[in-house]
A protein has these predicted regions:
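N-terminal anchoring/stem segment of glycosyltransferases
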Residues: 1-59, 70-73, 77-78
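Catalytic core and acceptor-binding pocket of nucleotide-sugar-dependent glycosyltransferases
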Residues: 141-204
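Membrane-proximal basic amphipathic "stem/tether" segments
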Residues: 4, 11, 215-260
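Conserved donor-nucleotide/metal-binding helix-loop-beta segment in metal-dependent transferases, i.e.
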Residues: 91-120
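Preference for solvent-exposed, low-hydrophobicity sequence contexts
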Residues: 184-186, 193-210, 215-228
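Short beta-strand-to-loop acidic/aromatic patch adjacent to the donor-nucleotide binding site
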Residues: 77-87
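Short, flexible, basic/aromatic active-site loop/helix in glycosyltransferases
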Residues: 124-138
Length: 260
């Protein structure tokens, strides 16, 4: 398959421009042989790098309207969608990405998720590495790293929706429009961690970046508080299976403290 059939689209906007140098430092460290054209979406700001082209949009207040403008400027069959705070943490196998891209054509898929969150609902005959994200699955579509058929992604986005509204509503819309053509991997094809939450650095991300010799300027973007980190850890530990067996009065007490 021709390399210009897939472009990498990093969705972002100007308020997150302080993250771009760090994102691309991690990106090119772990995917140094990326053969695909890379696009960075913003509003007006630019990022100067020989391997990165800019996509500009009007100053919309929502993710979806910006994404529509960005994606409409890309002329490719497929796009690999990522967000600007996905910090790559392991070397990307370019041959594996190319093989997964071939499966998009072979099985006429509209989306192939490269990070298993959530895992596929069921397997695919003859394909041990990918499975189906079935209709009705929670977060069937989201903004984790995914190879999209560009026209399908544009079809699922609605102007005015926030990123989180897109993830919820596009999953519902995809049930009718793309019932059997959304798949995902069982193991990460691209390994990364999310670095930003509610506009602040995750402390865990800062520790990982420090091991890489990367120290973000916290005067530009602060870190979450230790309390917020602890709360997130507890909420993650108290996952849905645990919450389901807790008595109501215990859940109500926990909700007061941890907002879940």
């Amino acid at each position: 398959m021709k390399k210009n059939n897939l472009f990498v689209y990093i969705s972002s906007f100007d308020d997150y421009s302080d993250i771009w140098p760090i994102f691309f430092q991690c990106f090119f460290k772990y995917w140094s042989d990326c053969p695909y054209q890379i696009y960075l979406g913003s509003v007006r700001k630019k990022f100067d790098h020989s391997q990165v082209k800019m996509l500009h949009a009007n100053a919309h207040s929502n993710w979806s309207s910006r994404a529509i403008e960005h994606l409409s400027q890309i002329k490719s069959t497929y796009v690999l969608l990522m967000l600007e705070d996905y910090m790559l943490s392991k070397k990307v196998n370019t041959k594996e990405i190319a093989s997964l891209l071939e499966l998009m054509d072979t099985y006429d898929l509209n989306a192939l998720r490269l990070y298993p969150d959530p895992l596929p609902s069921r397997g695919m005959s003859g394909q041990p590495n990918i499975g189906f994200q079935d209709m009705g699955q929670l977060n069937r579509t989201n903004t984790h790293a995914t190879i999209w058929r560009r026209e399908a992604l544009l079809d699922l986005i609605r102007p005015g929706e926030s990123l989180w509204e897109f993830e919820i509503n596009a999953s519902i819309r995809s049930n009718n429009t793309y019932p059997g053509s959304i798949c995902g991997v069982w193991k990460p094809a691209i390994d990364y961690y999310m670095a930003i939450g509610k506009g602040k650095w995750f402390r865990s991300a800062l520790r990982k970046l420090a091991k890489e010799g990367i120290f973000p300027d916290l005067s530009l973007r602060p870190a979450e508080t230790p309390y917020t980190e602890l709360k997130s850890f507890i909420l993650k530990w108290l996952g849905k299976p645990v919450r389901a067996i807790l008595p109501l009065h215990v859940r109500q007490q926990l909700k007061r403290f941890f907002s879940f």
